[in-house]
Amino acid sequence: MKFGYHNHDFEFSESLGGEMLYDIMMKSTDPKLVIQQLDIGNLYNGGANAAEIVKKYPGRFSSIHVKDEIKASEGNEKYESTILGAGIVNTKDVIDMVRKKSKNVHYIIEQESYQGKTPLDCAKEDLAIMKKWGY
């Protein structure tokens, strides 16, 4: 049995003793016992960069909430999710980096904001993008 952890934004925006909470958690957990589910959108809302985190912790992620982000149009969040490839996240590069360093990773396409489109229309667009990228 393994324990799994899904990040939010605070792990990247808050620190303890000058060290980012996410870094503390990663160095304090055994990868054989604790799997990581990286949420790219939450990471960006916390002020981090997905490519940098994936490079820093190769092989540590068993699943990824794949999101692209744009500046939020309303609410308290800095960013909101959008169609893959339409925002500021280098999503394809992040997926490719994880695929090279990790085995059996699950990619969960997640979009929580739709910019006037229906969720189903967005899912169709995201699927088309993933196919275009070769996945």
Predicted regions and their residues:
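Conserved anion-binding
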Residues: 2-14, 21-22
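Histidine-acidic metal/acid-base catalytic patches
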Residues: 16-38, 42-135
